[in-house]
Swiss-Prot record:
Upper lineage: Bacteria, Bacillati, Bacillota, Clostridia, Eubacteriales
Protein name per its UniProtKB record: Elongation factor Ts
Pfam family, one: EF_TS
Native species: Acetivibrio thermocellus (strain ATCC 27405 / DSM 1237 / JCM 9322 / NBRC 103400 / NCIMB 10682 / NRRL B-4536 / VPI 7372) (Clostridium thermocellum)
CDD domains: UBA_EF-Ts (cd14275)
NCBIfam families named among the record's database cross-references: tsf (TIGR00116)
Start and end residues of each stretch annotated as Involved in Mg(2+) ion dislocation from EF-Tu: 80-83
Gene name of the encoded protein: tsf
Amino acid sequence: MVTAEMVKELRERTGAGMMECKKALTEANGDMEKAIEILRERGLAAAAKKAGRIAAEGVVDAYIHGDGRIGVLVEINTETDFAAKNEDFRTFVKDIAMHIAASKPEYISRDEVPAERVEKEKEILRAQALNEGKPEKIVEKMVEGRLEKFYKEICLLEQPFIKDPDKTVQQLLNEKIAIIGENINIRRFVRFERGEGIQKKEENFAEEVMKQING
């Protein structure tokens, strides 16, 4: 059975349209990797088609919030130096750095989240569901659903893009790969926040970054 979540995942991984993704998954009997192959054969999977190509060029860029309270360093790679100088790519890098400043991701993708952290989160979510009086037979489904939300909060590629929340960072990345015509890889980032770890008044940094973007 092909679910909406499967269609969404395939779309995020390939950049193909919703209907094309649904057709490919149906044809592949729900096999994600086979569906990607089908889309590639049809020339519809721009991001997946380029994903295996080495991206060793690119840039390291920085974003400093206006008053110096937040700083981000990010490395994003392309296949060629020519693409790295592309204005659309440069704008993308700046946007990603701003997004990181505002949304505080901890990892690039869910593959980077340590297994022990995932297990600990599952234990917490399971305890929460049981404390809510939910029947044990549906607790595991609830845990899986809430775990997806957890990934969306801490993984950069799964977060709603700060400047256009209707798309994820992964979808934005897929769009740029299709436009620029090269593989693009968000390799690593580090986010600094002044006074981090020191008890202080809570600030809405996402709101402040958006004000600066729109200002």
